[in-house]
Protein backbone atom coordinates (compact mmCIF):
# COMPACT_ATOMS: atom_id res chain seq x y z
CA UNK A 1 0.00 0.00 0.00
CA UNK A 2 2.86 2.26 0.78
CA UNK A 3 4.59 1.49 -2.53
CA UNK A 4 1.49 2.18 -4.56
CA UNK A 5 0.98 5.46 -2.80
CA UNK A 6 4.56 6.51 -3.44
CA UNK A 7 4.37 5.46 -7.08
CA UNK A 8 1.25 7.51 -7.56
CA UNK A 9 2.91 10.52 -5.94
CA UNK A 10 6.08 10.34 -8.02
CA UNK A 11 4.40 9.44 -11.29
CA UNK A 12 3.07 12.98 -11.58
CA UNK A 13 0.39 15.20 -10.19
CA UNK A 14 -2.35 16.18 -12.58
CA UNK A 15 -2.46 19.76 -11.33
CA UNK A 16 1.31 20.32 -11.81
CA UNK A 17 1.34 18.81 -15.30
CA UNK A 18 -1.62 20.94 -16.35
CA UNK A 19 0.08 24.12 -15.14
CA UNK A 20 3.30 23.33 -17.05
CA UNK A 21 1.35 22.73 -20.24
CA UNK A 22 -0.52 26.00 -19.87
CA UNK A 23 2.70 28.00 -19.37
CA UNK A 24 4.36 26.31 -22.34
CA UNK A 25 1.37 26.95 -24.55
CA UNK A 26 1.45 30.68 -23.73
CA UNK A 27 5.08 31.07 -24.83
CA UNK A 28 4.83 28.73 -27.83
CA UNK A 29 1.59 30.17 -29.20
CA UNK A 30 1.59 33.96 -29.77
CA UNK A 31 -2.18 33.92 -29.98
CA UNK A 32 -2.62 32.21 -26.65
CA UNK A 33 -4.13 34.12 -23.78
CA UNK A 34 -1.96 35.10 -20.81
CA UNK A 35 -2.96 33.77 -17.41
CA UNK A 36 -5.90 35.64 -15.94
CA UNK A 37 -4.94 38.94 -14.31
CA UNK A 38 -1.62 39.34 -16.18
CA UNK A 39 -1.05 41.53 -19.31
CA UNK A 40 -0.32 39.82 -22.59
CA UNK A 41 3.50 40.10 -23.07
CA UNK A 42 3.10 40.57 -26.83
CA UNK A 43 0.67 43.44 -26.33
CA UNK A 44 3.05 45.00 -23.80
CA UNK A 45 5.95 44.67 -26.27
CA UNK A 46 3.92 46.21 -29.08
CA UNK A 47 2.90 49.13 -26.86
CA UNK A 48 6.51 49.71 -25.82
CA UNK A 49 7.63 49.70 -29.46
CA UNK A 50 4.96 52.25 -30.37
CA UNK A 51 5.93 54.42 -27.41
CA UNK A 52 9.60 54.16 -28.38
CA UNK A 53 8.83 55.20 -31.97
CA UNK A 54 6.82 58.18 -30.69
CA UNK A 55 9.63 59.29 -28.38
CA UNK A 56 12.20 58.90 -31.17
CA UNK A 57 10.07 61.08 -33.46
CA UNK A 58 9.79 63.75 -30.75
CA UNK A 59 13.56 63.72 -30.19
CA UNK A 60 14.24 64.11 -33.93
CA UNK A 61 11.76 66.97 -34.21
CA UNK A 62 13.27 68.70 -31.18
CA UNK A 63 16.76 68.30 -32.64
CA UNK A 64 15.60 69.76 -35.97
CA UNK A 65 13.98 72.72 -34.18
CA UNK A 66 17.18 73.35 -32.21
CA UNK A 67 19.28 73.26 -35.41
CA UNK A 68 16.94 75.75 -37.09
CA UNK A 69 17.08 78.00 -34.03
CA UNK A 70 20.89 77.81 -33.98
CA UNK A 71 21.16 78.72 -37.67
CA UNK A 72 18.66 81.56 -37.29
CA UNK A 73 20.51 82.92 -34.26
CA UNK A 74 23.85 82.78 -36.08
CA UNK A 75 22.35 84.67 -39.04
CA UNK A 76 20.82 87.30 -36.77
CA UNK A 77 24.15 87.83 -35.01
CA UNK A 78 25.98 88.08 -38.36
CA UNK A 79 23.37 90.54 -39.69
CA UNK A 80 23.59 92.61 -36.52
CA UNK A 81 27.37 92.86 -36.92
CA UNK A 82 27.12 93.74 -40.60
CA UNK A 83 24.07 96.00 -40.63
CA UNK A 84 24.34 97.48 -37.14
CA UNK A 85 26.31 100.42 -38.55
CA UNK A 86 23.80 101.16 -41.33
CA UNK A 87 22.48 104.44 -39.90
CA UNK A 88 25.97 105.65 -39.01
CA UNK A 89 27.34 104.68 -42.43
CA UNK A 90 24.48 106.46 -44.20
CA UNK A 91 25.28 109.64 -42.29
CA UNK A 92 28.97 109.30 -43.20
CA UNK A 93 28.13 109.26 -46.92
CA UNK A 94 27.63 113.03 -46.77
CA UNK A 95 31.24 113.38 -45.64
CA UNK A 96 32.38 111.13 -48.50
CA UNK A 97 30.34 113.22 -50.96
CA UNK A 98 31.90 116.46 -49.73
CA UNK A 99 35.42 115.06 -50.10
CA UNK A 100 34.63 113.88 -53.62
CA UNK A 101 33.11 117.24 -54.60
CA UNK A 102 36.17 119.07 -53.28
CA UNK A 103 38.43 116.92 -55.46
CA UNK A 104 36.18 117.15 -58.53
CA UNK A 105 35.88 120.93 -58.23
CA UNK A 106 39.51 121.24 -59.32
CA UNK A 107 39.94 120.44 -63.05
CA UNK A 108 42.60 117.92 -64.06
CA UNK A 109 44.67 120.63 -65.77
CA UNK A 110 44.66 122.74 -62.63
CA UNK A 111 45.75 119.76 -60.52
CA UNK A 112 48.78 119.27 -62.73
CA UNK A 113 49.60 122.98 -62.68
CA UNK A 114 49.51 123.45 -58.92
CA UNK A 115 52.76 123.29 -57.02
CA UNK A 116 54.10 123.70 -53.53
CA UNK A 117 51.72 123.84 -50.55
CA UNK A 118 48.59 123.85 -52.75
CA UNK A 119 49.63 120.59 -54.44
CA UNK A 120 50.23 119.02 -51.04
CA UNK A 121 46.78 120.20 -49.95
CA UNK A 122 45.06 118.60 -52.97
CA UNK A 123 46.97 115.36 -52.52
CA UNK A 124 45.98 115.38 -48.85
CA UNK A 125 42.28 115.59 -49.75
CA UNK A 126 42.63 112.74 -52.24
CA UNK A 127 44.45 110.63 -49.66
CA UNK A 128 41.76 111.39 -47.07
CA UNK A 129 39.03 110.26 -49.47
CA UNK A 130 40.82 106.99 -50.26
CA UNK A 131 41.47 106.31 -46.58
CA UNK A 132 37.87 107.09 -45.66
CA UNK A 133 36.46 104.76 -48.33
CA UNK A 134 38.89 102.07 -47.20
CA UNK A 135 37.61 102.35 -43.64
CA UNK A 136 34.00 102.17 -44.82
CA UNK A 137 34.86 99.02 -46.79
CA UNK A 138 36.23 97.50 -43.59
CA UNK A 139 32.66 97.58 -42.25
CA UNK A 140 31.10 96.20 -45.43
CA UNK A 141 30.29 99.56 -47.07
CA UNK A 142 31.36 99.68 -50.72
CA UNK A 143 30.90 102.18 -53.51
CA UNK A 144 28.74 101.15 -56.48
CA UNK A 145 30.65 101.47 -59.76
CA UNK A 146 27.87 101.87 -62.36
CA UNK A 147 29.64 103.77 -65.17
CA UNK A 148 29.48 101.78 -68.42
CA UNK A 149 27.26 99.08 -66.91
CA UNK A 150 23.67 98.25 -67.74
CA UNK A 151 21.14 100.24 -65.71
CA UNK A 152 19.98 98.23 -62.69
CA UNK A 153 16.92 99.65 -60.88
CA UNK A 154 17.99 97.81 -57.73
CA UNK A 155 21.29 99.73 -57.58
CA UNK A 156 20.75 102.85 -59.68
CA UNK A 157 18.34 105.78 -59.80
CA UNK A 158 17.96 107.25 -63.30
CA UNK A 159 17.70 111.05 -63.25
CA UNK A 160 17.83 111.70 -67.00
CA UNK A 161 18.54 110.13 -70.40
CA UNK A 162 21.49 110.88 -72.67
CA UNK A 163 21.01 110.37 -76.43
CA UNK A 164 23.84 108.13 -77.63
CA UNK A 165 23.60 105.64 -80.49
CA UNK A 166 27.14 104.34 -80.00
CA UNK A 167 26.31 102.30 -76.89
CA UNK A 168 23.58 99.88 -75.93
CA UNK A 169 20.43 101.67 -74.81
CA UNK A 170 20.13 101.66 -71.02
CA UNK A 171 23.86 101.97 -70.34
CA UNK A 172 24.92 104.21 -67.45
CA UNK A 173 26.74 107.15 -69.08
CA UNK A 174 27.08 109.57 -66.20
CA UNK A 175 27.16 109.38 -62.39
CA UNK A 176 25.68 112.37 -60.60
CA UNK A 177 25.96 110.99 -57.09
CA UNK A 178 27.81 107.87 -55.95
CA UNK A 179 25.81 104.98 -54.57
CA UNK A 180 26.84 102.57 -51.83
CA UNK A 181 25.94 99.09 -50.62
CA UNK A 182 26.44 97.51 -47.22
CA UNK A 183 26.72 93.76 -47.48
CA UNK A 184 23.94 92.77 -49.87
CA UNK A 185 21.75 95.78 -49.08
CA UNK A 186 21.66 99.09 -50.92
CA UNK A 187 22.66 101.88 -48.58
CA UNK A 188 22.02 104.51 -51.24
CA UNK A 189 21.38 104.02 -54.97
CA UNK A 190 23.72 105.69 -57.44
CA UNK A 191 22.06 108.64 -59.20
CA UNK A 192 22.86 108.32 -62.87
CA UNK A 193 22.21 109.42 -66.42
CA UNK A 194 21.29 106.60 -68.82
CA UNK A 195 21.86 106.33 -72.58
CA UNK A 196 19.04 105.98 -75.10
CA UNK A 197 18.79 105.62 -78.86
CA UNK A 198 21.38 102.86 -79.21
CA UNK A 199 20.80 99.18 -79.96
CA UNK A 200 18.66 97.19 -77.55
CA UNK A 201 20.43 94.99 -75.03
UniProtKB/Swiss-Prot annotation:
Q: Where is this region: Disordered?
A: 1-40
Q: Which GO terms describe its biological process?
A: protein folding
What GO cellular component term, any one, is given? cytoplasm
Cite the InterPro entries for this sequence.
Answer: GrpE, GrpE_coiled_coil, GrpE_head
Q: Does this UniProt record's set of keywords contain Chaperone?
A: yes
Residue stretches of biased makeup (Polar residues): 1-11
**Protein function:** Participates actively in the response to hyperosmotic and heat shock by preventing the aggregation of stress-denatured proteins, in association with DnaK and GrpE. It is the nucleotide exchange factor for DnaK and may function as a thermosensor. Unfolded proteins bind initially to DnaJ; upon interaction with the DnaJ-bound protein, DnaK hydrolyzes its bound ATP, resulting in the formation of a stable complex. GrpE releases ADP from DnaK; ATP binding to DnaK triggers the release of the substrate protein, thus completing the reaction cycle.
Q: What family is reported?
A: Belongs to the GrpE family.
What is the official name of this protein in its record? Protein GrpE
Q: Which organism is it from?
A: Beijerinckia indica subsp. indica (strain ATCC 9039 / DSM 1715 / NCIMB 8712)
* Biological classification of the source: Bacteria, Pseudomonadati, Pseudomonadota, Alphaproteobacteria, Hyphomicrobiales
Gene name in the database record: grpE
